Design a protein with these regions (language model features):
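Low-complexity, flexible helical/coil segments
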Residues: 1-11, 35-47, 98-105
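Glycoside hydrolase catalytic-domain groove-lining segments
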Residues: 1-33, 49-61, 70, 112
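Glycan-binding loop/region signatures in secreted carbohydrate-active enzymes
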Residues: 11-43, 81-96
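Aromatic-rich peripheral "rim/lid" segments of glycoside hydrolase catalytic domains that contact
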Residues: 45-46, 54-58, 66-114
Length: 114
């Protein structure tokens, strides 16, 4: 059983691994990304898919994707304040709701009939 795996949604996130969430400057007001990061939801979706393929090939009985949503890291149309890029969530926090990201759709494609 894999209890937690995931990736953020920006170019270079796979190389940072669990440190992907550290790209936010929380001392800024309002908080902002700490560099010129580029949103790429396919990075996150591809990583999850690749890992699930490995887990399946190795006979892993189950795996928990980290995580569904991170409300403290909301999406913004302004790339400097799109904290969702630093989120491991498969959906983005938008206002009081959420919207699916490419990773959500990939998981749905794989497991939607189960």
């Amino acid at each position: 059983m894999i209890v937690e795996f995931g990736c953020c949604a920006f170019e270079g996130a796979t190389e940072l691994g669990p440190a992907g969430g550290t790209i936010v400057d929380w001392t800024a007001d309002p908080p902002a990304l700490a560099g010129p990061y580029r949103r790429n939801e396919q990075v996150q979706a591809g990583y999850l898919s690749q890992q699930l393929d490995v887990f399946e090939a190795e006979g892993v009985h189950g795996a928990y994707v980290f995580e569904f949503i991170e409300p403290a890291r909301p999406w913004s149309p302004d790339p400097r304040h799109d904290l969702d890029m630093s989120s491991f969530g498969v959906v983005k926090a938008v206002g009081d709701g959420w919207e699916p990201k490419a990773a959500f759709h990939e998981l749905s494609r794989r497991y939607g009939s189960h």
